[in-house]
Amino acid sequence: MHRRCSSTPHVGVADARDALSMFVAQLNTSIDGEFVFAGINSDVAPMEDYFGTPASAAKLAVDAAFLAEFGITQSDPAVANITAADMTTFLDGAFAALFDDPAWGANWSTASDQDVSSRISPDTVIETGTNANISPFRKLAMAFTMMADLGGETVNDQAFKVLTDKASVIASQGIHELALAQGDVGVDQQRIDRADRIMSLQLDTLNQGIINLESVDPYETSTRLNQLISQLEVSYAVTGRLQQLSLVRYI
């Protein structure tokens, strides 16, 4: 069987492994101890290092699925005998299922589907950001894993073409969906910016009110208050006399 140059797949696999590791690291981004893509589970990193030690749950799940499908591991030289048709069946079946629920939540991500909610005005609450469970992230993880850990160093040309073609399609879909998700986040950011401007104006108004109160002459205020009290006392006295006159008239 004709084989391509052995160095070619190694280059592709190495790049894919680096890309998968960078992808996981980005989804584990944290700010002030809170993980940005974890949803409301923001105190826990949503993803494990796929190639970490000990092996991640995702890596173990992929290994188990590959072994169950082909009866060999990804590093077995017999991977060269996997046909294009068999690889297609695996990618569309058992492998794809690893990125759907419940497998995704069990093996890949501890993120919550519920995003963090923030009150941006007295009567407006919005979900801010997104989480590692959305479709584009799953598709990118799938594409990187196809190239990084399905025997790309050893598979024959036809099976390798199945891997690269499928990974390219899935990655393109993921990138497109991610752009749409970024647009949604951008809309939320605009709402937050608008709320910030409104709250800034409100704060300026309150600060000006405090300044105005602090600039009032205490003596003048006291004098005016005493005058008001005196006026009230006179009013009560007059009212009382009128009531008495009314009673006298009708007794």
Where are these regions (language model features)?
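Amphipathic alpha-helical polymerization modules
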Residues: M1-A45, G151-I251
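Polar, low-complexity export/assembly segments characteristic of proteins
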Residues: S21-V24, N28-E177
